[in-house]
């Protein structure tokens, strides 16, 4: 895999390595979907609907015709189509063939198609986790007005392109759809089975720095899922431990994810603060919090995680990142 193999064990980002991993993963998704793909040009890029269908049994889930339609719609999309925004349950949803919508459309869409199956499945999984961890059996998601959140997210994307262009490219390559929901303390999530979709709660996009952090956070989860597709990092991923990113015990594999995204968040926020001295104070406050929680997560992993050979190389790089970020913070 050349540059991609090095990228697997790297906390950071190189454009060539990211492209290599993305292409290899996309080829695997198409291989698994081959029985239900229509004749003609293949999808030019991945999509959460395709990834979700590739994980179903039988392949394609319950709607192979929908998979075929989605595949055809992506044939000319290019490797980085425009980011789509989806608000499940909103009356203003105007879905296209990919099951996403332009939330700025205020026309009458009473006959719009329903929320795509992959998205319903994803929000159901998130609700089940919220109900289990909170004990609130009646917890539910509502459809927020996403316009302010979208504006904050787009401003955050512009900032990321300026202060960390490699991370902006990675996000453009990995994230296809933003799903906006509102419910309790839910902030944000990524699910491996709907790779390409980011689920955002209203609090995660309440300001531009919050949206910037959420973008780094959830793109970071995508990046680590992509790396682990090629190489697992731990052999005891199911062992439960506590770490500073979650209030309840989570598997070791989840703590590795926490450390990865916290390192990305701390680094991106550090670059923003350095590049723009007039950045809002919230930027440095979020950076300091991410760095503090990164140290706590590493301390939770060090005595517990059992690393593979690739995982050991990755963790060594993570330790180097944390050391350099801490030194920069103290200087």
Question: Where are each of the predicted segments found?
Answer:
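Extended, composition-driven regions rather than compact fold-specific motifs
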Residues: 191-193, 198, 254, 259-266, ...
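N-terminal low-structure segments adjacent to metalloprotease catalytic domains
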Residues: 1-129
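Pan-zinc metallopeptidase signature
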Residues: 284-331
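Long, charge-rich alpha-helical interaction segments
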Residues: 250, 267-275, 282-298
């Amino acid at each position: 895999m050349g540059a991609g193999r090095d990228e697997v064990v790297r906390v950071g980002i190189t454009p060539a390595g990211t492209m290599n991993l993305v292409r290899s993963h996309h080829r695997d998704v198409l291989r698994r979907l081959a029985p239900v793909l229509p004749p003609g040009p293949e999808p030019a890029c991945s999509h959460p609907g395709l990834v979700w269908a590739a994980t179903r049994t039988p392949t394609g889930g319950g709607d192979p015709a929908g998979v075929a339609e989605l595949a055809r719609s992506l044939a000319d999309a290019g490797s980085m189509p425009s980011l789509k925004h989806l608000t499940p349950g909103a009356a203003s949803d105007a879905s296209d063939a990919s099951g996403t919508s332009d939330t700025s459309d205020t026309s009458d869409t009473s006959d719009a198609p329903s929320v795509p199956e992959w998205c319903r499945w994803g929000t159901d999984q998130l609700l089940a986790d919220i109900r289990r961890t909170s004990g609130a059996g009646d917890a539910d998601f509502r459809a927020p007005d996403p316009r302010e959140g979208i504006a904050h997210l787009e401003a955050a994307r512009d900032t990321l392109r300026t202060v960390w262009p490699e991370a902006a490219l990675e996000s453009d390559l990995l994230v296809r759809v933003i799903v906006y929901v509102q419910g309790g303390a839910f902030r944000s999530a990524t699910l491996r089975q709907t790779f390409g979709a980011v689920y955002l709660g209203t609090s995660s996009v309440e300001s531009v720095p919050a949206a910037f952090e959420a973008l780094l956070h959830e793109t970071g989860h995508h990046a680590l899922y992509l790396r682990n597709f090629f190489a697992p990092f731990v052999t005891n991923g199911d062992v439960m431990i506590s770490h500073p990113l979650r209030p309840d015990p989570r598997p070791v594999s989840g703590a590795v994810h926490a450390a990865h995204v916290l390192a990305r968040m701390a680094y991106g926020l550090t670059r923003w603060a350095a590049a723009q001295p007039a950045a809002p104070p919230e930027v440095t406050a979020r950076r300091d919090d991410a760095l503090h929680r990164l140290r706590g997560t590493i301390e939770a992993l060090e005595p517990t995680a059992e690393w593979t050979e690739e995982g050991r190389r990755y963790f060594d790089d993570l330790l180097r990142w944390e050391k350099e970020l801490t030194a920069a913070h103290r200087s």
